[in-house]
């Protein structure tokens, strides 16, 4: 042990390049899909980080529509986080099998509150909550000129000439019915009982976002972060009840007894849920988490742009080596890893995937998009969004202190492992994802990789020094026009 103390040399993204290879594939034809687990297939290998300035329901919806996955952060109350998950699951459905409904005796105020909370434009009305026989429908059109919201729904709902369809109606058949009758919602009934709902918006979204990552019921995929704190059991329970697809046990040091015990407990309690555990940086840690029951291991100790773990605690492994070491172990188990942190350009994404990652987790590259929950600021005439590490003082005071095993400390005693800052505003997420995946596609074309599995197994690296890195970036020129996929 003593003799091997300095034996290991590690590499990160700026130390390596992929070697071009003979290719018979064009970038537009490569396959970017990845099967992370039995129940979680993504159409692009990108996951938005579970950080309080990166991912809430708005980001998670946008990520899933692009084919990726969003992790709802846990710096909020249990019920609030479950609501965020439910917003994602209800944002898009092929067929809504358990639609919201109200009864005629409830108030218009209650209908308005429900429709506003879940951003829906109408709700079916049933005779009672047990029999659920359809008796009407209430839409924004019915509420347009209502001034007294205390009146009962029965006084304003549409009751006559209701258009319905049987439960086995396909989306194609539903679209024709909706267009014929110029309506937006089609209740599905069996013997008069409400059994489902199809909306024109859901049909339009299927057409607009054909690459969306969905579950077996046609709903968008969503993940949520949990920790190892006192509220973890109830938090996990509420998230599962809300329909979460992936639970992420998110800690700064995944190779610890508390995390391993939590993995065993969560997997035993919810065996049907895809379970991610991390963060780690070694093969040994990866092995222990997989043996404890994790489906996926998240890799990265301190590489993030807002993380100070490596300088505060002096601990970490440069990210390319960490990914490769953990992926080498993951191959023995037939399971996946997520490369989390340190990614600055699209070229770093493909390096992470070629080194063994099945997907990457992004924070800083997405924090500036419209869909992130970070506050918008104007600084020196430019627009920015707030971005902070979950180990920053602000994030720890809000609830992420358990991630760094400081749950029992008073705020004045916190030892932060992250900073708070701002990142340039980038506009819509889909534009950023388009550029990032364009770079990945280009890299796969250069390496002759038809899909991500081939990239992982066949791509080769060359090491480079500081001169090679300098040569890789634009040099001997003053940049006068900013590129959408390069800033330095």
UniProtKB/Swiss-Prot annotation:
InterPro entries: Aldolase_TIM, CBS_dom, CBS_dom_sf, IMP_DH, IMP_DH/GMP_Rdtase_CS, IMP_DH_GMPRt. Keywords: CBS domain, GMP biosynthesis, Metal-binding, NAD, Oxidoreductase, Potassium, Purine biosynthesis, Repeat. IMP binds at residues 305, 340-342, 363-364, 387-391, 417. It comes from the Bacteria. CDD domains: CBS_pair_IMPDH, IMPDH. Residues 468-488 are annotated as: Disordered. GO terms for biological process: GMP biosynthetic process; GTP biosynthetic process. Residues 475-488 have a biased composition (Polar residues). Disulfide bonds: none annotated. Belongs to the IMPDH/GMPR family. Homotetramer. This is Inosine-5'-monophosphate dehydrogenase. It comes from Staphylococcus aureus (strain MW2). The gene is guaB.
